[in-house]
Amino acid sequence: MAANSSAVSSDGILIGDKLYSGVMISLENCLMAEERCALTPSVVDGIDVNTEIDLRCVGCELVQAAGILLRLPQVAMATGQVLFQRFFYTKSFVKHSMEHVAMACVHLASKIEEAPRRIRDVINVFHRLRQLREKQKSTPLILDQEYVNLKNQIIKAERRVLKELGFCVHVKHPHKIIVMYLQVLECERNKHLVQTSWNYMNDSLRTDVFVRFNPETIACACIFLAARTLEIPLPNRPHWFYLFGASEEDIKEICLQILRLYTRKKADVALLENKVEKRKLFIEEAKAKAKGLLPDGTPRLENAPEFSPSLKNDSPKELKANKPSPLAVHALKNCKRKVDGTKRPTSSSPVNGRVSKGRDSRSGSRSRDQSYSRSQSRSQSPKRRKSQSYSPSSDSKSRSPSRSRSDSPPHKPNHGSYKSTKGHVYGNNSDYKYQGHKRRSRSRSSSPSHSRSRESSDSGKYKKKDHYYRRERSRSYDRVSHRGYDREYHGHSHHRR
């Protein structure tokens, strides 16, 4: 009943009246055709065949050495090498780092074979292998931002391996198959033959035979090669491997691949990485040139040979954009003036109803008109000056705002009858307070008339203030004398009492 309801056809699975597409998951789907193995993505990107073979061998050696340091089982190491070979039949060595993919395959294989290892341990092991390869001193890996970036790259590489392989990561290893076939041939007691066959099988992982042939055929080839090496006779009429479904041509091809592995010279990893890097730069430059860019990504400034800017009708927006800005023109003029050594001409046009005067004519204007003097231009507003000039402070010589802002020394007024002792002290003292202002007035005054105009302007102020202080002093003197008279009178009356 069930057989009638569902039937399998070449187009899919027929269930009832509906035809469903089927997905066949089998290890035979992981095998590569001969044409696909000859034209790999790395060869398409410009890497020669020998360089690609060396890169595959080096990558598988790294996986094997890392598995030994991580104490992984041999099955996990074999799985990692097979995944490495499968991935680089779909992607190129130019676009993907060989070392990063090897780390990802080790980490993925440890989880597949139920012997997981931390990704940090995988990174440390590969770091140690690089130090041994470059003959460097053993130093621990620093956990900085570079380590975090490397960890993220390995995680991304592992996801990429899963995506490219379609999550078909199961590998059938011929280890158990070798033991089973030797039991059929009644040679399982010969430990030397078993171990040699096992060794050939482990060495064949560095080649691409696991991507091209079935594991049963590989097991037969390893037994055949071990028996020939140890000179152990096996049935040959007919050949014993016909019993297990292997052909003589496949056996010979696998044996030749394994023997070529022993005749190859040891590859220089630094030289291989240099070749890959050069090819990568060449491809990037070719892409940039095709897009009309420089190798660093900036656009080219040269025009096309048949392009004429004068023949193109510019729109108003383009004309406005092509017009130079006034700031650029002004900056260009200033640069020309600096080169020529000429001064910037002053404009004679009035600004806000006043004619702007230059720095050279400032001294003459100050001597003729007091309103243009620096002391009045820097002085405060009339209300504030009036409020501060009549402050109760008696030490107005050093704290008056008008005096602190003026650049010339104060003019000593001569009033004849009244002579202050403080004035004599100021006149004879070398540490006069306004001596620093005197130095600054010499350095900042532009002409003698400039300083004389400021002295005349300040003298009027000092005269007015001095009259005020004289009146204040006379009043205070009267009050003091009156108090003294009172004290004297009270004391005299007390004496009389």
Swiss-Prot record:
Biased composition (Basic and acidic residues): 357-371, 452-461, 469-491
GO MF term (any one): cyclin-dependent protein serine/threonine kinase regulator activity
Keyword flag Repeat: yes
Subcellular location: Nucleus speckle; Nucleus, Nucleoplasm
Cellular compartments per GO CC: nuclear speck
Signal sequence, renumbered to the chain: none
Start and end residues of each stretch annotated as Disordered: 293-497
Domain observations: Contains a RS region (arginine-serine dipeptide repeat) within the C-terminal domain which is the hallmark of the SR family of splicing factors. This region probably plays a role in protein-protein interactions.
Protein source organism: Xenopus tropicalis
Family to which the UniProt record says this protein belongs: Belongs to the cyclin family. Cyclin L subfamily.
Keyword line: Cyclin, Nucleus, Repeat, Transcription, Transcription regulation
Biological role: Involved in pre-mRNA splicing.
Gene: ccnl2
Protein's name in the database: Cyclin-L2
Ranges of compositional bias, category Low complexity: 388-403
Biological process according to GO: regulation of transcription by RNA polymerase II
Residue segments, region RS: 366-404
Region Cyclin-like 2: start-end pairs: 176-260
Spans annotated as Cyclin-like 1: 61-163
Record SMART domains: CYCLIN, Cyclin_C
